[in-house]
Amino acid sequence: MRKQRIQERSLIGMLITLGVVYGDIGTSPLYVMNALINDAGQLKNATPDYVIGSVSLIFWTLMLITTVKYVLIALRADNHHEGGIFALYALVRHRAKWLIFVALIGGAALLADGTLTPAVTVTSAVEGLKGLPKLGAFSQYPWLVPLTVTVILLVLFMIQGFGTAVVGRSFGPMMLLWFTVIGIFGLINISQAPVILKAFSPVYAVQVLFNPANKMGIFILGSVFLATTGAEALYSDMGHVGKANIDATWPFVYTTLILNYLGQGAWMLTHYQDAAWRNATNVNPFYAMVPAGGQIAMIILATAAAIIASQALITGSYTLVDEAVGLKFLPRMIIKHPSNVRSQIYIGAINWLLCLVTLGIVWLFQTSAHMEAAYGLAITLTMLMTTILLSQWIHMKGHRALALALLFGFGALETVFLTASLTKFIHGGYLTLGLTLVIFLIMVVWFFGNRRRLRYNQANEQISLLDYRNQLIQLSHDDHLPVFATNLVYLAKVDHQHRVKRSILYSILDKRPKRAKVYWFITINETNRPYDCSYSIDMLGTRNIVEVQLNLGFRKSQHINLYLRQIVTNLIADHSIDPQYSRYGITQPRQVGDFKFVVQNQQIMDLASNPTMGQFDRLLIGGRVLLQNITPSPAIWYGLAFSDVLEETIPLFTKPATDATLTNLTVHHARTPQRNSRQP
């Protein structure tokens, strides 16, 4: 209900939107114009034609890609109010099988390029300290900037596990202040050089691509593209704040951003021939256009905005990974909910992996100029993949002409940006492309390895408990076998037809049968209510086979052993199962017996046992099993670390391979059994 209220257009919703959605795109003015000066070589090379044309490129890039493609079109492609490339893929995946590769490439690139966003944003903000005479140490000792950035980011990553709801309440007002201030300073500087308003004409945007002052040629678009890298995050965060609030706030955000870019351009026009600036190679007009008396306050505000942008990126990464897990693109991970809001999650493994890579990038590149040279390459891939999926969605809605126009129009535009960004490869873009490739391969191996395994693997065939009910009852009362456990528990997904994986009954009945007083098959359902804790029981017409549907809220601890003990106690009190008296124990009398939890793992040793399996399938399935075995065990997910847990290795294939390679030649000295004979 609270999320629904936030998604409706309201002042509170719009304020939250400013803090959640626009962190990345809103802090781009910190480094975009700086990157364009670096492309020119020195400020004196930034001629009026170069500056006006560059700002014009920024204006029209934000207009076409962010406003038209994402705000006006993409936000309408919501999946139950959720946005982002994986949510979009879920809408169109039935249209063509190859679309999965589009989604995997886009998602992998978005995750990979996200490691650079906190690094470049916070570094650009902190580098403003170099321009303060009272803090000359930052200019004298270059390592102070990455050290300061490291401390800020390390603290930011450390507080993630505690939840950011309290801090998050200040994000909206802080970003409102940020956009207002940068817009005002931009407007002040525009008044010093009104000629910069020519940038609204697309003619200057086209001319600068061929202007001699532009030494980069078309590759200048690699720096211009940095202004719109946050557009994909804008779409991904739709589920947190709602389309209506983004529609209402984007005109304000867009206006202040353009005012600031125009203001920076105006400052460059009025200072590019000044003796104090003309030979400068690393000038950031964002800080330079602020009066000296206000620079400290601006640096503090910029750092706060950079932290907010980084926070939004981190939580966005959690959401993206959570969606990938739901689509079976990635292995299951331990996900925590620090607050009562369902969408606010924390994934420790992703948090610290992101922290490690981001800090590594900070120390590898050390300056924002070096980071800018590497930033944006992978995200162009994501935008291109989103365009492909978006055209499929529009076509699905019956607008074929519009779908083709979007595919070829934005596809061509983003292909040009991708081509222009290829120069970033040798300047560090190889790092994000390498990360993209690694993440992509992991998702391919997990998803397709699972699908290929299901093709060969009869261990995952669903079979009904009802068909084996009599065997389980007989096994439970078979005095010829020792009791394996009083309560034998399998964490199994049981459907409404009482079907479970074949491997579970294979574990109980085959090999060495496991005799137990009661067999438990528990299905754990996570609900949207934070503290939900309920269960339902199906005894299957017996007294020793129990199906449990355990419903736990997303904030409820998943200590299954404690819940199960309560369920057993209640069933004994209801006379649904027999008391489980124990002869020994420090607490007597005790009606609840012992528990044995069985967790099944697969190994790759028997991959060679199926002669019909191709080498590529063998590689995919083996990789999938290896990934499964290095991720947390279900015993950890369900709080069974101190319980009696049997980690059982099961074969990939429970049906023997039909490879008729043996021929029986003869049997010597066989002994025929005698009727009624008692001979050994």
UniProtKB/Swiss-Prot annotation:
Pfam families: K_trans (PF02705), K_trans_C (PF22776)
Chain segments annotated as transmembrane: 12-32, 55-75, 98-118, 143-163, 170-190, 216-236, 249-269, 288-308, 345-365, 374-394, 402-422, 428-448
GO molecular function: potassium ion transmembrane transporter activity; symporter activity
Any single GO CC term annotated in Swiss-Prot or TrEMBL for this entry: plasma membrane
InterPro entries given in the database record: K+_transporter, K_trans_C, K_trans_N, Kup
Methyltransferase among keywords: no
Reactions that this protein is recorded to catalyse: K(+)(in) + H(+)(in) = K(+)(out) + H(+)(out)
Subcellular location as annotated: Cell membrane
Keywords: Cell membrane, Ion transport, Membrane, Potassium, Potassium transport, Symport, Transmembrane, Transmembrane helix, Transport
Keyword Ribonucleoprotein found: no
Chain's role: Transport of potassium into the cell. Likely operates as a K(+):H(+) symporter.
Family statement: Belongs to the HAK/KUP transporter (TC 2.A.72) family.
Protein name in UniProt: Probable potassium transport system protein Kup 2
Classification lineage: Bacteria, Bacillati, Bacillota, Bacilli, Lactobacillales
Name of the gene encoding the protein in the UniProt record: kup2
